[in-house]
Amino acid sequence: MQKTYLWALVSLLASSLVDARSAVFDQTPLDIGGSDDSFDSIARIDPNSNDLLKSEMDKVIASSELLSLHRALVEIKSISDNEQAVGGFLMDYLYSKNFTVEKQFVDYDDPTGKPIRTNRRFNIYAYPGNSASPGIILTSHIDTVPPFIPYSLSHPEPASFKREDILISGRGTVDDKASVACQVIAAMDHLEKHPDIPIGLLFVVSEEVGGRGMSTFSNSRLNSGTYHTIIFGEPTERALVAGHKGMVSFTIRVHGKPAHSGYPWLGRSAVSEMLPILTEVDRLGDIPVSQGGLPSSEKYGRTTLNIGFMSGGVAANVVAEEAVANVAVRLAAGDPEDAKDIIFRAIRNAATKHRKDATVVISNGLERPKGDIEVIFGLEAYGVVDIDADVDGFNVTTVNYGTDIPHWKIYGDNVKRYLYGPGTIFVAHGKNEALTVGELEAGLEGYKTLVAKAAERERS
């Protein structure tokens, strides 16, 4: 891991020597004699000349500080709970650009959600000089979902090559290393032009698995409350997000009684009892509140549920003793505690309708069960998150995914929160995670616009 990020840093710094005239890096295409929108030398290449095509695509990446930084970040594996290597690389990179960098260690969780002390993974908080409490902060996460997918380049039409159409693929290319790279370069550009208006960078771990990185920052001295604008990075297709749905998660655990499958009446199948419960749970977002369903709203649409995992039993010839299901709820309205009440009532009603003497209890999942059916709610729960979207020139949308925004406690009045980034969430966790050079570079311009608007607020 150490060698990987050191190699990436050396390669990236070497590429930056192409133009060391200032701290702001040239974002214009490398001129190799082509027209404004294509490279003639590549347009004449036989489409089957893969080696030459790859070489020219590599040149495009190496010629840009943004694209080179993005590549270096993506090439370092940083699956949640294992972000140390990419964190070390990013710290060294920011040091080399004259940022003051603070490392904030983040604990791991045990099964109860209590922190386990460790010095392995860490957040990164960077700022210029002694300006530890800037008014503007850019923040993204440096962890990714599994599995790791290596960085690669391709082009849909090699015979009519355009640099902006180069497709950059790999885990984290979109979520969230595109935003990390853009935010770093946007901050450097801003500080070169406006050194009197400091800007901070916060890169956190663990966003994909509960948000402990942001929670750690939020509860620390670094969350000074002196900021007036926070710009969060996530894939939004370069739209400003006016808000996102809330989140509730829960596990259902059914305890049955094992028996020989030839004599099922001698036991009680946990799987058979789970099925009507899940059928009822699955429809909670589709029925009105008056009929026991979960709320909807004009802004966010209907609440959705996903039964993401289910298991039960040990063999076809054994009546199942245990069954487990995990469910994620994206709340479109209402309080998460009210949603939990609705969910619990639905589970209890379905269970007792199937078997009158069924006992349903809320549990922490760790103690000896006190009922036939346990409902275990996750530690993370929050309602809808409304976000600012008042900067001209952007499309405005809402999203269904969760972010670190609710994990950051805001101190002070009139703090603007923006959510923006290049790439689409539709590929973010998939095997086809990717974005084009054009999308990444346009994302940088959007961040520059948001930073400029934030700087205007500071001047006023």
Swiss-Prot record:
The active site is at E207. Zn(2+) 2 binds at D175. One of its GO terms (cellular component) is extracellular region. Its EC number is 3.4.17.-. Glycans are attached at N98, N395. GO terms for molecular function: metal ion binding; peptidase activity. Keywords: Glycoprotein, Hydrolase, Metal-binding, Protease, Secreted, Signal, Zinc. Zn(2+) 1 binds at D175, E208. The keyword Zinc applies. GO terms for biological process: proteolysis. It is an enzyme of class 3 (hydrolase). Binds 2 Zn(2+) ions per subunit. It is found in: Secreted. Pfam families: M20_dimer, Peptidase_M20. Its main location: secreted. It comes from the Eukaryota. InterPro entries: Bact_exopeptidase_dim_dom (IPR036264), Peptidase_M20 (IPR002933), Peptidase_M20_dimer (IPR011650), Peptidase_M20A (IPR050072). Belongs to the peptidase M20A family. This is Probable carboxypeptidase TRV_02791. It comes from Trichophyton verrucosum (strain HKI 0517).
